[in-house]
């Protein structure tokens, strides 16, 4: 079977205009996939040079396949049909290692056509490393490497204002563009680089904050033989992802034209502020997950897909989203409903087996950040507690018993909560405390909730009533009136 390379698989090759820090599955099935579509359908005409930012020889370099690889995008389409779409990606030209090819790395700054920098160096990547020096070849941190590359660009083109870059980080931290810019400026000052360079950084370059959203499932180890048989070639860099994707970029409106989004619309939004989109994702996507997990798991289900195929549990989740979460969010309702519809479709994706127990990790913190704001906003707006979000809190407390149908299951959270719940449920079993007292103790934990939730009118009583129903009737019976 042939292996991918440009000799045996000839096709378009594009001039290098994009530098990408990070060779991982996510960027390849997200950014490079989108660039490939834009190259095909518009005159974007931009090739990617991948820079491996860490010192490792595994996985091998994309250059072993001349930058070629296949994405397999699969899930439910807009009509709810299961689809699987294989695409040979030609947007990546080559990969270089910043550790073994440092001179080649610096040379990227000399190319007048270079315009964009994308990155995904993990959440820990946009961070300060105290020991980094200008003369390191290379520096350890990504921001320090980028500072050195930007200075090379500035020096080579004598500070020309038309040679700046649009820098678009994809790391999962809040306002990632602002965070990266601050660190680049910090290194520039610590290294005593010229004031003219610092001015050029500000005037000629854009650091754009982003919100990225796509589940990338990566190399399909269990199915690779079957998939390669269908493709007719061997691919060491096969990359699988869900059908849905969203790229929100906080940047200048001109970016839409530069990326040719005006000629071939992708699900990319150029916005003034990513904050409402971040809140939408946390509240609807993450919030629905967090409400779903303890209810569905204690109803005897194991995956998100099973839960969405269960009529009652699915109705519970959808009513929570449409009746209790969306009404208190600050974006146009039609936008929110469209996003919610995409979310429930993603939850039903038959190609992804998302285990409920793996999403249950750190459930107490997830409830505080993802659901509590909407629960309190609903109570404030209507004077009554949102029934399903409140029930989800009762289900969460019940989940920490660690037992389903007489069998134990692992509960993962910080040690404080695991010990606390062990003690509380033990006291409850021994009838030392009643349900309402147990709930009150949990809700009074100011250090966790950042407030005393026992002061929210009716919350202790309603959660205790729901919890009693779960304990006495079982989850199925208890949740049914809310479905």
Curated annotation (Swiss-Prot):
- Catalyses which reaction(s): D-altronate + NAD(+) = keto-D-tagaturonate + NADH + H(+)
Any one of the GO CC terms: cytosol
Q: Which GO terms describe its molecular function?
A: mannitol-1-phosphate 5-dehydrogenase activity; tagaturonate reductase activity
Q: Which GO terms describe its biological process?
A: D-galacturonate catabolic process; mannitol catabolic process
Where, if anywhere, are coiled coils annotated?
Answer: none
Q: In which pathway does it act?
A: Carbohydrate metabolism; pentose and glucuronate interconversion
List keywords of the entry alphabetically: NAD, Oxidoreductase
Assigned EC number: 1.1.1.58
Residues binding NAD(+): 18-29
InterPro entries hit by this protein: 6-PGluconate_DH-like_C_sf, 6PGD_dom2, Altronate_OxRdtase, Mannitol_DH_C, Mannitol_DH_N, NAD(P)-bd_dom_sf
Pfam families in alphabetical order: Mannitol_dh (PF01232), Mannitol_dh_C (PF08125)
Q: Which PANTHER family does the UniProt record give? A: ALTRONATE OXIDOREDUCTASE-RELATED, MANNITOL-1-PHOSPHATE 5-DEHYDROGENASE
Name the protein family. Belongs to the mannitol dehydrogenase family. UxaB subfamily.
**Protein name per its UniProtKB record:** Altronate oxidoreductase
